């Protein structure tokens, strides 16, 4: 192992002194004091020696403390003034004649606190002019002995009070010693050669051949250095960006929709009955203003027929939900509970010509649920969903798309389980395998039911899926509490890797 010359000089100091433990002053006889700590830090990183720190609290007199030591503390000045002038008392207002302006309040307060005086009709009356003051004694002692460890518990309390009064300050002094470890002991058993080092070659050295007289200092890429945290995006933003790039690379197009939606677009078009529990106030945020929105009448009639009896005009699609559909409910506004509404609105906007062409779209955006906040639920979170519409796509194609999508996100092991959603049939849940955690549910998917597509005149099959990005972020970042994502803990943000695939 090649050592720096300063490291060698430090080890040679141990070798020459025949000691295993040395302090800073002893080592500075062999190597400049400012280089000792740097060399010791390097050697401790190589496990050659251990840096031992001994912290001591010490007192230091302030200018006020020094002045009080040379003359008197304010309380004593007042007592001596009364004594020297043969007075029985002194009016409080006359304190300004004896003390500085900033001393009068503190002096009077301390005289009363120490129970040395009484106040009689605005006059200060001393009980004993020759009183003994512990603060004066401790202040004198501090001028001779700075080490707090040499003081009793009562004296330390007095010192703390003197600090509050500005007579002294308390500092922490760190004494360092350096002890050789086994690697260092083995190293100094052999002669230590110190050859002058250079960090760069000059033309003159090469031409004259003097470069042979020097050691060229090698670069050590493993030497401990200060950690630097560059500016970077929030981990959640990085995951959103990554998912966006993955889907675009798979040929998808991004679409958007508004946060506030009518129940028609958020629920009715997805064949979710109006009495479904998910539409209750405990699960959905209803908008107070505007509390209603505009619903396209032609689509409303078609969706209403599907819900009530499964028909559009005279065409029978299914049995429907067999209940009385309320158009007023469809007009109510909510904060969207999913981003699937973006895909539905996109499908509804397609012209007859566009419906003939394959479509692949996705949406990444915020959704809102009236959830109780806990370690795995938030009322606002990011969701990603997508659809594929084409002539011959089927359930197998859906599984293939999902596996490819998850593989690009870094999940090699994926398994599919059957599931139920009101607007897809068949439906599935995809689980991914993570070392140490096992199989974890990550997304839901399925094939849109005819009841969802027929009102828009779409005859081709449409594959649909959705994934909560907060859930993905928790898996990626090893979090057990979803709230940690949004606490903005600066230490966690600095130390979280830019990519966690």
From Swiss-Prot:
<feature type="binding site">
    <location>
        <position position="448"/>
    </location>
    <ligand>
        <name>L-phenylalanine</name>
    </ligand>
</feature>
<dbReference type="GO" id="GO:0005737">
    <property type="term" value="C:cytoplasm"/>
</dbReference>
<protein>
    <recommendedName>
        <fullName>Phenylalanine--tRNA ligase alpha subunit</fullName>
        <ecNumber>6.1.1.20</ecNumber>
    </recommendedName>
</protein>
<keyword id="KW-0547">Nucleotide-binding</keyword>
<keyword id="KW-0436">Ligase</keyword>
<comment type="similarity">
    <text>Belongs to the class-II aminoacyl-tRNA synthetase family. Phe-tRNA synthetase alpha subunit type 2 subfamily.</text>
</comment>
<dbReference type="GO" id="GO:0005524">
    <property type="term" value="F:ATP binding"/>
</dbReference>
<dbReference type="GO" id="GO:0000049">
    <property type="term" value="F:tRNA binding"/>
</dbReference>
<dbReference type="InterPro" id="IPR004529">
    <property type="entry name" value="Phe-tRNA-synth_IIc_asu"/>
</dbReference>
<dbReference type="InterPro" id="IPR022917">
    <property type="entry name" value="Phe_tRNA_ligase_alpha_bac/arc"/>
</dbReference>
<dbReference type="GO" id="GO:0000287">
    <property type="term" value="F:magnesium ion binding"/>
</dbReference>
<dbReference type="InterPro" id="IPR002319">
    <property type="entry name" value="Phenylalanyl-tRNA_Synthase"/>
</dbReference>
<dbReference type="InterPro" id="IPR045864">
    <property type="entry name" value="aa-tRNA-synth_II/BPL/LPL"/>
</dbReference>
<keyword id="KW-0067">ATP-binding</keyword>
<keyword id="KW-0460">Magnesium</keyword>
<feature type="binding site">
    <location>
        <position position="340"/>
    </location>
    <ligand>
        <name>L-phenylalanine</name>
    </ligand>
</feature>
<dbReference type="GO" id="GO:0004826">
    <property type="term" value="F:phenylalanine-tRNA ligase activity"/>
</dbReference>
<comment type="subunit">
    <text>Tetramer of two alpha and two beta subunits.</text>
</comment>
<feature type="binding site">
    <location>
        <position position="423"/>
    </location>
    <ligand>
        <name>L-phenylalanine</name>
    </ligand>
</feature>
<dbReference type="InterPro" id="IPR006195">
    <property type="entry name" value="aa-tRNA-synth_II"/>
</dbReference>
<keyword id="KW-0963">Cytoplasm</keyword>
<feature type="binding site">
    <location>
        <position position="425"/>
    </location>
    <ligand>
        <name>Mg(2+)</name>
    </ligand>
</feature>
<dbReference type="Pfam" id="PF01409">
    <property type="entry name" value="tRNA-synt_2d"/>
</dbReference>
<dbReference type="GO" id="GO:0006432">
    <property type="term" value="P:phenylalanyl-tRNA aminoacylation"/>
</dbReference>
<keyword id="KW-0030">Aminoacyl-tRNA synthetase</keyword>
<keyword id="KW-0648">Protein biosynthesis</keyword>
<keyword id="KW-0479">Metal-binding</keyword>
